[in-house]
Amino acid sequence: MVKRVNLALQGGGAHGAFTWGVLDRMLEDDSLEIAAITGTSAGALNGAAFKAGMARDGRTGAKQALDTLWAQMGAVGDLRMANWIAGFDAGPLLNVLKMAAPFSPLEAVSQAISPYSYGPFYRNPLRQVVDRFDFDEVCADTGPELYICATSVQTGKVRVFSGTDISTDAILASACLPNIFQAIEIPDPETGARDAYWDGGYTGNPALFPLFRHDLPDDLIVVNINPLVREDVPKTAHDIQNRVNEISFNSSLLRELRAISFVQRLLAEGTVERGRMKRALVHMI
């Protein structure tokens, strides 16, 4: 018997490689079918690769697409990627550096220099990876539904891209940390005005609400790569900023999980008539 589930893929730089491993294992289980994916930042990249591969050659294609994605990510030779690739933790190299100084040199540079200071020489190093996606496959009707989350700079609200609205710029917007990359401008579908977007993690890491349709499965698996709990209180400037980032990028997810819990309680108590609101069974990896 095939079990249909939805996936919610968090962002977190190279920690997204953990999600790659989770997806690779799921693809080996023929009893599991992915109905829909919502993703932010690295989760958006993983989701796009998964969807494109499934559209091209089913489970085998998805495995190959994920392998290719992370091979390309590892080959990006740009110092600005150091902070993004490391996610919210500085990683082994920067951990060595921070022992010799109260701050990370690369982090200090990224905080002091605006991405707009590069002038005409600016290039987003992620574009060379995202441009290689076949968007006929990413936006195909076959395979799981895909939702990509980004944050509007002007309104501070989440925008969810789906269907043919998913593009190179939509994925770059979802992964746009503003101290590293220039905001990504995308036309508003209603007004035509070009709106600026930053990383989706600020408002939806990832957004869960696109999955609350009655035609989608009740089961939702959240692949969590940002620690919800840390036992130790951070003391160094780096560790403090690291924890602030973790809390900030988890806050939107926690709000939605609390809302889900509230609705499920109302359904269980009979306060809300069954069928009027979505039943949700949330699992976390």
PLM regions and their residue ranges:
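Patatin-like phospholipase
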Residues: 1-38, 48-285
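Gly/Ala-rich beta-loop-alpha elbow adjacent to hydrolase catalytic centers
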Residues: 39, 43
